[in-house]
């Protein structure tokens, strides 16, 4: 549960092989990439992405409360997330915390839309019939802003 609350994905079900960039899953913010050390596989690509700002999506931690939701719903319907009726991302993983009946998970959000998100905004989804909230861990703050 803490892994989802802190937005730390693992495994091939949460991280798409050959398509997910290290910066999308916040490895740069967690100290998983060195931009001082050279000569490692992918070093030039990672540096170019970081310094040119080419990341288009970011993983963020989400949560929502819905007693009627079951995880099997996610496989049967669209897992898209909306902000003001605009598709801005998708749910990657979910897990129920039985202590407080809250679903915690990770979503992939378009970075171009993330700057529009404010604390009082709630994201919408079709599969859970609930408002999704994002609680950014301290390592993700301040939020990226539109350039």
Where are each of the predicted segments found?
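Glycine-rich, small/acidic residue-mixed loop/short-helix segments
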Residues: 30-31, 48-147
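Anionic-ligand-binding alpha/beta catalytic cores of soluble enzymes and soluble regulatory domains
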Residues: 2-64
């Amino acid at each position: 549960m803490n892994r989802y609350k802190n937005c730390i994905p693992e495994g091939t079900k949460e991280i798409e092989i050959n398509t997910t960039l290290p910066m999308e899953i916040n490895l740069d913010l967690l100290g998983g990439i060195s931009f001082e050390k050279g000569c490692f596989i992918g070093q030039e690509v990672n540096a170019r992405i970081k310094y040119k700002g080419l990341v288009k999506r970011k993983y963020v931690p989400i949560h929502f409360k819905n007693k009627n939701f079951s995880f099997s719903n996610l496989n049967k319907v669209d897992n898209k997330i909306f902000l003001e009726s605009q598709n801005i991302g998708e749910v990657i993983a979910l897990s129920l915390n039985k202590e407080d009946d809250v679903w915690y998970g990770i979503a992939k959000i378009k970075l171009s839309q993330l700057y529009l998100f404010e604390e009082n905004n709630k994201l919408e989804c079709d599969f859970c019939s609930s408002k999704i909230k994002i609680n950014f861990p301290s390592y993700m703050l301040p939020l990226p802003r539109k350039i």
